């Protein structure tokens, strides 16, 4: 965890052991969704200095807003016009916005 003048950054680890191990992946993604949704609804940020990545990218609009997301998309297009640098990691597909 980190403390800044503007606030704090907390890290969490979630653990579960479902009776049916085949649902573990779904439970993992459900935990991410619940944690990120609750954080966004409380006004918290979801990416901090670690970036967004595939698990956080669909929640990035909570941090940046629609205008910020559009600006980030334009910057990404300017520096990576062919979309070859980590495709799908930073931004959700354009039709998902």
Predicted region positions:
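Conserved glycine-rich FAD pyrophosphate-binding loop
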Residues: 1-97
